[in-house]
């Protein structure tokens, strides 16, 4: 896979500051809701549920926007869509209970009953992998395939995006860049190595990691779906802090350079702000419990936004994914 080595160039910082076409549009929608809107902009809606908190997330996957049927099997499409919704629960430290699924299939004769069965087989497999259940759903005719997954979970100590404080360390689970490397390979028509294909087609929602971090002092957390640079910006904006990222510290998938890792989206690892006392011993305990590495890549300071350095040199953060980029 040397030809696919990911070293994407940097662009502007529009997505990195919690802004950009998509997020400006969301802010405009939220403003219309006024005082009726509560807690919008987090990974999940969080509702009191007895002594615990109910976490609810919804995630839409649309053909030719989030997936292509010539790249993924229908079972992989179902798994991937479900993992995206479950990853939001992980970011809030929640335990999944179940999902509701709306499935849209083309009315132009392209689909068969088996296609829908295979999509739902992938949904079911992803849900079972985290000990949850499919609770129901809907089947409709659609111009394109779509899978809309609503995930429900419960949290003992929910973690929002808004709790980071100056002095906190910024950590990331796993390794970054594999999803971006896989996407380059698919676009080039390459056959992907099994591990790399799984990274893209069957990502693992970090449920156990999110729950462990919630129990061990996580102050703010977000899943990396839009790319490191963009999601750091979202967490910084929600918490009202400046986050400084040292790019050379970012743990990368083999064959991926740090700038490429910072731009790669749909990684579904967790970015978390932890108090200063969390250090090497905490990282070792995390790995022993979850089987995942966790790496400190930066810190929170006073101020606003994102600063990114590469071996001590200030750089422009790479652009992250935006559904509605500025033209």
Language-model-derived ranges and their functions:
Residues 1-28, 72, 107-135, 140-147, ...:
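Glycine-/charge-enriched secondary-structure boundary and capping motifs
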Residues 1-91:
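N-terminal glycine-rich phosphate/pyrophosphate-binding loops that anchor nucleotide-derived ligands
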Residues 31-33, 40-43, 133-135, 156-159, ...:
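Glycine-rich, charged/polar anion/phosphate-binding loops
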Residues 51-54, 61, 95-185, 299:
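Glycine-rich anion-binding loops of enzyme active sites
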Residues 90-95, 237-239:
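Alpha-helix C-terminal capping segments
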Residues 165-166, 208, 263:
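Residue-level recognition of short, solvent-exposed, well-ordered loop/turn junctions
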Residues 180-197:
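Short, compositionally biased
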Residues 199-203:
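Long, charged amphipathic helices and adjacent flexible linkers at domain junctions
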